Structure formats: structure tokens, C-alpha cells
Design a protein with these regions (language model features):
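Catalytic machinery of carbohydrate-active enzymes
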Residues: 1-299
Length: 299
């Protein structure tokens, strides 16, 4: 969600950027036109990754240092100006609104993704032989508690693909590496529908596919934010996570959440972050479908 802030920082200070990010963000930030260098941070035992990062950046006196993680290592390097996000300050503000406090223009800038021509061509190649319009679902997430049940995604997909909005079109299933099984289950149950299973595809070609898609529906996940940043009409499904903070932001986005608030779901005495199953079961197919058709009517 910080790509919009990066854009404004580079514009305001007329600067090139060195971006430090995790492996998932490497391909995204390397395509930003003002990126000079990307340093990929990979976690190591005993937090040694911070020491290795310090060695890479300590030799430079930075004009502007922006730290969104409030890491001590950034205090150990030279910088003319420091912009630090205070992560200790609890807030119910959306993440992007929180980042506006660091924005030199004092504005909320929507996240965005930069793609090259060859990226878009790769997206087209992945869709060759399949008929539009394209409807994307992401039935997985990095945490089981925020996963809407597979059978709900299956029935929702069937209903939407049989509607006038997508008749003759293609269902696309996306997700991260290691989440392939749910895609296979949905494909088996929806045998008569044209489906492309792209679960496990790298982030850039996935983003390119989103560019040609009419609608995205998925759990609260990075791919949800990616779709919204691309400009794909996006519906995010929420339960144990707070949509006030993590809702998808873009030109055309909506949220559907469980009747219970995130606080109510997380305060259950039987809740266990590591072992609890889906907390999304109270979110009905009818509710999601209603919002989907409402969005489609406005497109």
C-alpha cells in the first residue's frame, strides 16, 4: 500500500529511490520508474538480516530516509532528513491514511502498480484461447481464519459465471505458492465452466492478468490489494481483519464483511491465531453476490 507514497516522495524531493522490501515486493518496486536500486530483505535467524542490511546502507549519506517499519537500523545510518512511521501509535485509520502523515503533499495517494509492455504481453499470452469477460477469484489467504469457505467461492463463481455479465466468459483462480489444492477442488466442481487456474503464478504476470479482468473477488490478502492497485473492480471479503484499516483502495473497490466485527470474532475465548479455522462462515453467498451484481451494474 506504500507505492503511492513512494511516488509522491520521489516527485516532491526530485529523487531516485533505493527501496528495501521483502521478496514479494522486489518485482513491483523494480518496475517503478524512479527506482535506482532494490535491496531485498530476507529474514535470517537471530535477526541477522538487519545487520546485513546495515552493512549495505551505512556507507551512504541519504538525502531522505523514509522508514515504514520503525526499525532501529535506520537510526544507525546518516541521513539529512528522516521520515519515520510510528508503529507504536495504535489507530483504526486505514493504512493509506496513516501513510499520508508522512506524505510531503499531506494527501492520501492511492496505491499503484507499474507494468512494462512485456508484462502486459505476458498477461495476454496467459489468456490466449480463453474468452472474455474474465472473472477472478482468490479463495486463499495467508491465514486460515480469514479464508471464506471453498464451497462458498464455488457456488458464488457458478452463480456469477452463469449470469448475463459473464456468460461465455472465463473464471480465473489465483493464489500464492502452496495454495494450489483449493484451485483444483473448485475446478473439479465447476467442470462445465471455462476456468484458468493460475494459483502459484508470480506476482507480475498475475498483475498483468488483472489488467484484462472485469471483476475480482477475494479474501483479505496481498492479491486483493494488487487487483485494486491495478484498477480492476475489486471486492474484498473481511472477517477477523479490520476493513477500516485494510480495505482495498482503488478506482472501483468495495468491501463485504461478516455480520460480526473483527473485534467480536477475535475475542472468542476459543480463538487461537495459529490453529483456528475459518471465521468467515457467517458471511453468506447471497450477501457477496448482491454486492457483486451491484458493482457490475455500475461498470
Amino acid at each position: 500500500m506504500s507505492t503511492g507514497l513512494l511516488d509522491d516522495l520521489c516527485e516532491f524531493y526530485q529523487a531516485k529511490a533505493t527501496v528495501i522490501c521483502g521478496a514479494l515486493g522486489e518485482d513491483i518496486y523494480s518496475r517503478y520508474p524512479f527506482t535506482e536500486k532494490v535491496i531485498t530483505l530476507r529474514k535470517q535467524k537471530y535477526s541477522f538480516h538487519w545487520y546485513h542490511l546495515w552493512k549495505k546502507i551505512k556507507g551512504t549519506r541519504w538525502d531522505v530516509l523514509c522508514d515504514l517499519r520503525s526499525t532501529p537500523v535506520t537510526l544507525l545510518v546518516r541521513a539529512k532528513k528522516r521520515i519515520i512511521l510510528n508503529k507504536n501509535k495504535k489507530t483504526s485509520q486505514h493504512r493509506v491514511i496513516g501513510l499520508a502523515r508522512l506524505n510531503p503533499y499531506s494527501r492520501n495517494t492511492l496505491p499503484r502498480i507499474w507494468l512494462k509492455k512485456e508484462d502486459l504481453n505476458q498477461g495476454k499470452d496467459l489468456l490466449l484461447g480463453h474468452s472474455p469477460p474474465f472473472f477472478v477469484i482468490c479463495p486463499s489467504a495467508n491465514w486460515e481464519a480469514k479464508v471464506w469457505p471453498e464451497e462458498n467461492f464455488t457456488q458464488l463463481s457458478k452463480n456469477i459465471m452463469n449470469s448475463n455479465y459473464f456468460k461465455g466468459g472465463t473464471l480465473i483462480i489465483v493464489g500464492g505458492p502452496g495454495e494450489e489444492e483449493v484451485g483444483k477442488i473448485i475446478m473439479k466442481k465447476l467442470g462445465k465452466i471455462n476456468i484458468i487456474n493460475l494459483i502459484g503464478l508470480p506476482i507480475i504476470p498475475t498483475a498483468a492478468v488483472f489488467c484484462f479482468s472485469k471483476l475480482y473477488i477475494g479474501n483479505d490478502s496481498g492479491l486483493m490489494h494488487l487487483a485494486a492497485s491495478i484498477g480492476t473492480p475489486t471486492i474484498g471479503l473481511f472477517g477477523p481483519t479490520d476493513d477500516n484499516i485494510y480495505a482495498p483502495l482503488g478506482k472501483n473497490t468495495m468491501v463485504v464483511r461478516t455480520p460480526e466485527s473483527s473485534e467480536e470474532l477475535m475475542s472468542d475465548p476459543d480463538f487461537n491465531h495459529r490453529t483456528s479455522g475459518s471465521l468467515m462462515k457467517s458471511l453468506t453467498i447471497n450477501k457477496v453476490e448482491k454486492i457483486a451484481f451491484e458493482m457490475l451494474r455500475k461498470l
